[in-house]
């Protein structure tokens, strides 16, 4: 009985301490919608979009694509051809329109360290009163079209939806190339790949998602990109109203820092990366050739740097099988854009991966799917959009 009394007393004491402690904040789930607003026309360079995706993954940009960048452009708006999807994010108190990118792990932004001539039309990060510069830390990025950016690193408050990372690494641009300054819709990038590939030197930093996932109901986010319309990101929960049927899950190999998984197209097995920061589907040459063999007058057009076809063509759908689930991309999504403004020749949304050891399933693929990025496993879940 003495032992029982001691245990009871201890239990009572623990319960009293617990009741005196503040309750842990409830875990959250929230949805952040992408922008829907009028955006003026701007010039996009289709071969440059292709080249940037290749160089992002360490691939070589062939000479014919480099040559095509010199004359390949189309005057359009981002919504019309789904070049990029932008999402509002509060960075150090400034609301900025960022590109959410599951193919990289950096959060970089236009900053007040840039000359005013390079920030026209952009929201600019200014460190908050709580923001601190990380002495000796820096970052640098470059892409296949010659664009580049780099600068200093700060710790500051970053808020997406209702969730805040109070000491998030923010990569503030102090120098930036003209290609970025011309895109006045985009104030930077928020990476959602794995923190292991963050490029900050001398020590990589944690992504926003890794910083806040303990605050979420579940350590996941789900992506609903739309064809020629704004989509949404669900953080911490799965919205069953956004897909039909059941989710099919597949294991992720994150050894290279990406959301990589196994898939099949036709009779060909391949590894693929789900990348919201890449516009196109970039796949094995044989798969691209098999697909375009079904499209009259389609060919690998060296002048324009990739597969083209008559804009009047009716394109077949494209199917990627993932752990038994057939993810179907409608042909209209693959008819990406005219090679120049008003042209009757269109640039394909499926292109050759130029020998990369994996394929990239970018927005052309993702905007027909509801995709769950689950850090437990890790794993990916796929279902058709509702």
From Swiss-Prot:
Cited InterPro entries: Aspartic_peptidase_A1 (IPR001461), Aspartic_peptidase_AS (IPR001969), Aspergillopepsin-like_cat_dom (IPR034163), PEPTIDASE_A1 (IPR033121), Peptidase_aspartic_dom_sf (IPR021109)
Where along the chain is the active site annotated?
101, 275
The highest taxon in the source lineage is Eukaryota
Q: Where does this polypeptide localize? A: Secreted
Q: CDD domains, per this entry?
A: Aspergillopepsin_like
Documented EC number(s):
3.4.23.18
- Annotated propeptide span(s): 21-69
Cellular component, GO, one term: extracellular region
Induction record? Expressed, albeit at a very low level.
The residues the entry assigns to the signal sequence are 1-20
Q: Which GO terms describe its biological process?
A: proteolysis
Q: Which cysteines are joined by disulfide bonds?
A: 311-346
Glycan attachment positions:
130
Its recorded reaction(s) are: Hydrolysis of proteins with broad specificity. Generally favors hydrophobic residues in P1 and P1', but also accepts Lys in P1, which leads to activation of trypsinogen. Does not clot milk
Which Gene3D superfamilies does this chain map to?
Answer: Acid Proteases (2.40.70.10)
Keywords per UniProt: Aspartyl protease, Disulfide bond, Glycoprotein, Hydrolase, Protease, Secreted, Signal, Zymogen
Does the record carry Cytoplasm as a key word?
A: no
What are the Peptidase A1 domain coordinates in residue numbering?
Answer: 85-383
Q: Which terms in the Gene Ontology molecular function aspect does this entry carry? A: aspartic-type endopeptidase activity
Note the subunit structure: Monomer.
* Functional description taken from the UniProt entry: Secreted aspartic endopeptidase that allows assimilation of proteinaceous substrates. The scissile peptide bond is attacked by a nucleophilic water molecule activated by two aspartic residues in the active site. Shows a broad primary substrate specificity. Favors hydrophobic residues at the P1 and P1' positions, but also accepts a lysine residue in the P1 position, leading to the activation of trypsinogen and chymotrypsinogen A.
Which family does the entry's similarity section mention? Belongs to the peptidase A1 family.
What's this protein's name? Aspergillopepsin-1
Protein's organism: Emericella nidulans (strain FGSC A4 / ATCC 38163 / CBS 112.46 / NRRL 194 / M139) (Aspergillus nidulans)
Quick one: which gene encodes this? prtB
